[in-house]
Amino acid sequence: RVLFRSGDQPADQPAERMQDISPEQNPLFHPDKRRCCPMPGCFAGPFCPCCPP
């Protein structure tokens, strides 16, 4: 779970909402690369797995 310092996250956007993001909504998502993200983008979060080398 990603922790936010107080003030980084609006009160109406709790951190739990981040877990609802699908890979398609990840800005680093590449639909033309077999539903994966090239490095280093795939290290930005658990929503977009690294593409195989």
UniProtKB/Swiss-Prot annotation:
| This protein's GO CC annotations | extracellular region
Establish whether keyword Flavoprotein is in the entry. Answer: no
The propeptide segment or segments lie at 1-34
- Entry keyword set: Cleavage on pair of basic residues, Disulfide bond, Secreted, Toxin
Main localisation, per the record? secreted
The organism's place on the tree of life at top rank = Eukaryota
Disulfide bridges in this chain: 36-50, 37-48, 42-51
Which compartments does it reside in?
Secreted
Tissue localization of expression is: Expressed by the venom duct.
A GO MF label: toxin activity
Record comment regarding domains: The cysteine framework is III (CC-C-C-CC).
Say which family it is in: Belongs to the conotoxin M superfamily.
- What remark does the entry add? The mature sequence of Reg3.4 described in Franco et al., 2017 corresponds to the mature sequence of conotoxin reg3l (AC P0DQO8).
User: What is the name attached to this protein's record?
Assistant: Reg12l
Provide the organism lineage as a comma list: Eukaryota, Metazoa, Spiralia, Lophotrochozoa, Mollusca
